[in-house]
């Protein structure tokens, strides 16, 4: 990048905290931020200096912008001169996201860490309720699962069920390296997805992740799949976000 780069801003999708630490330890200032088209992009962003950055957060709110967390559902609400007046010639859509007090409803759920660092926990529409009436935010759990080098993609499910479960797509490249070092003959991805070593490695990580979750959030069952999700396959959007409804129907 020319040797003159001072810092980079990361947005659009969550940056894995583990990866964020690696960047910072390597001297690469990758500062995670948050915003939407409707807010003229930036709402909050991490800054230089230890007092202005928190790993796992999207930083302090920028000057001139107000942010509050809705008491009833934790939705992030934004207000300020950078927030849009409304969608062009679409008052119905505008009314769905702008309230009478001028707060824009982002559709994202979050909280403040230490009173000033905004942290995104999930998308409001992706939160589901179990049969016991407990609400589960899948994104936070999925990010914990993807810290395992043998898990490439995952989706937490459980709406209307007694407990949460997960669909897991292995990182076949990393498992192939493991097999090579362990003297295990590599076959096809389909066959290796059911290999006992892969099941053991993934289950160990799931157990570790469960220890940091509330009892009602803990995964009771995981299904390891034999093919990656893709845009062409219809499971991912062009931004590589999960098409949850499609995946749920497919599996």
Where in this protein do the model-derived segments appear?
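Conserved ATP-binding/catalytic segment of the ANL
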Residues: 61-70, 74-130, 147
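Adenylate-forming
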Residues: 83, 117-146, 175-196, 215-219, ...
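C-terminal boundary motif of the adenylate-forming
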Residues: 109, 114, 148-173
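Conserved C-terminal "lid"/linker of ANL adenylate-forming enzymes
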Residues: 153-155, 203-251
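Alpha-helix-centered segments that form part of catalytic cores
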Residues: 1-13, 196-210
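Gly/Ser/Thr-rich phosphate-binding loop
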Residues: 1-52, 152
């Amino acid at each position: 990048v020319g040797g003159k780069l001072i810092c980079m801003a990361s947005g659009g999708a969550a940056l894995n905290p583990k990866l964020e630490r690696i960047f910072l330890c390597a001297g690469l200032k990758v500062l995670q931020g948050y915003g939407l088209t409707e807010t003229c992009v930036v709402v909050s962003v991490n800054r230089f200096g230890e007092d202005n950055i928190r790993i796992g957060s999207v930083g302090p709110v920028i000057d001139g912008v107000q942010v509050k967390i809705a008491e009833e559902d934790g939705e992030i609400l934004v207000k300020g001169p950078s927030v849009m007046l409304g969608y062009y010639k679409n008052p119905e859509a505008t009314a769905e996201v702008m309230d009478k007090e001028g707060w824009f409803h982002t559709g994202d759920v979050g909280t403040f860490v230490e009173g000033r660092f905004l942290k995104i926990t999930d998308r409001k529409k992706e939160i589901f309720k179990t049969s016991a009436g407990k609400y589960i935010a899948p994104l936070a759990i999925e990010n914990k699962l993807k810290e395992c080098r043998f898990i490439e993609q995952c989706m937490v499910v459980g709406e209307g069920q007694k407990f949460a479960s997960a669909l897991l797509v292995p990182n076949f490249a990393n498992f192939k390296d493991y097999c090579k070092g362990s003297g295990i003959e590599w076959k096809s991805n389909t066959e290796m997805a059911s290999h006992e070593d892969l099941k053991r490695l993934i289950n160990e990580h799931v157990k570790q992740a469960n220890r940091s979750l509330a009892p009602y959030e803990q995964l009771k069952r995981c299904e390891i799949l034999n093919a990656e999700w893709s845009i062409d396959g219809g499971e991912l959007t062009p931004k590589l976000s999960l098409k949850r409804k499609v995946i749920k129907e497919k599996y």
